[in-house]
């Protein structure tokens, strides 16, 4: 009878905390949005499921061996940990606080101690360490995106590169906004955290994950969820801004058909882009290097098998583990913070400012050019590929049934991918030194 009662007391249900319950509901909401509403299902399904797994009571799937040991709080383990950390207190809360300032040697010793007491790293923690903490996951995704990208529309109309650059204004505006909130005492964001939040404005999930994992890993869950949620909401967020900033006549502008781009141009462009960026901004080289490599495999025509693997099987496999890894950061004690609200608000501001900046840049360019651009393609400067370009095309068709802007909008859309990677390099360079 005692054994049965002990087994019942060990049921996770009796150890469920209110925060974990809320985050399990958040995970279910993400799954609902992905499955029923089709909001970025490729990422939100694994993120939502990972969020549920990481909040299951007593499972410890998203915690390291050290964190699992502290959570269990066995007296003999806490005594050993406090000796390593040189603490007078054996309380788990004090030990947990001391871990944030522990030296690498102390962390290594604690990890070995935890393993000696039969504690191990959780499954999701291992996924995170391999896929995100190492930086490998987002970089492989970028290679796959490069293999799927056609630079033809950008090369056929190079001035659309300016639209992609203008849309990154949302990133830097949001960084300043986050710092302003901190200075006013509304929120408490460090410079590194502000930079990581700002990248949401690039509408590029892999870049947001890459930058936040380097600058503010504690905010990774909220930043990734915000980035992919707002990317899915591009068809709802952008059209009102586009219509507000353009006249009916501007939306009716029909653009000239793009010229045919020579294969040699497509092969040479990723090489030239990589060399140029590497010489000017080395910190952006990892992202753009993998992006350009993927694109070169696509365009060179001699490695079809590698190109096909990069843009299909490989990117799909990595997406699964990347999503689960992001889900591991949706633990209640890390996600249910006042900062999360600030991130969600700043993220939507970043999207809106980036969209508006692209449209306004197109209007400005029209003042100095005889060949008119339809300002609607400026909104595609955010790097939500190809959703933003499709939105530009849809709004254009509403104004003029003969106005097909999709291929024209792909130019600034692809430029936005380059722009967000460059912006990420700038953030990493000046925040990390």
Swiss-Prot record:
EC number(s) reported in the record: 7.2.4.2
Species whose genome carries this gene: Vibrio cholerae serotype O1 (strain ATCC 39315 / El Tor Inaba N16961)
PANTHER family: OXALOACETATE DECARBOXYLASE BETA CHAIN 2 (PTHR35806:SF1)
Name of the protein this chain belongs to: Probable oxaloacetate decarboxylase beta chain
Gene Ontology cellular component list: plasma membrane
Catalytic activities: oxaloacetate + 2 Na(+)(in) + H(+) = pyruvate + 2 Na(+)(out) + CO2
Keyword terms: Cell membrane, Ion transport, Membrane, Sodium, Sodium transport, Translocase, Transmembrane, Transmembrane helix, Transport
Location(s), subcellular: Cell membrane
Gene: oadB
Membrane topology field: Multi-pass membrane protein
Family: Belongs to the GcdB/MmdB/OadB family.
Bilayer-crossing regions: 13-35, 125-147, 162-184, 189-211, 215-237, 267-289, 309-328, 340-362, 404-426
